[in-house]
Amino acid sequence: MIGYMILHDVSARDIQFKDKQFTRGKGIDTFAPCGPWITTKDEISDPQNLHITTKVNGETRQNSSSSNMVIPIRRIISSLSVTMTLEPGDIISTGTPAGVAMSMKEPKYLRDGDVVEITIERLGTIRNRIVYH
């Protein structure tokens, strides 16, 4: 593993609810944008202790830490490597902290034109405009 970067874990919930599984609703072209760069592994002493914020149109939707992840990064890599060959260049997504629209009492799903900004301590910030096709 060479390092860490931000990956915007986009989901098309309408497709996921219809299909009753997540694969197609996360695999749409343009989903999972990542960046803004790779921070090398040696620059991050504890990847399980990074502050994470997600804003939609400037409104904070997620304010958490990688310490709150359900499965630690090392365990994710170990588990995946048992069933598949991990190759240089592979990207492994750890998922997202609490605060996704689906879990809200009154869900605020992303709309055409919304701007999503994700910041992870020491990894930078990515901004993506939602465009419906």
Residue map of PLM features:
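N-terminal accessory regions of nucleic-acid-interacting proteins
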Residues: 1-4
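Catalytic-pocket segment enriched in acidic/His residues
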Residues: 13-133
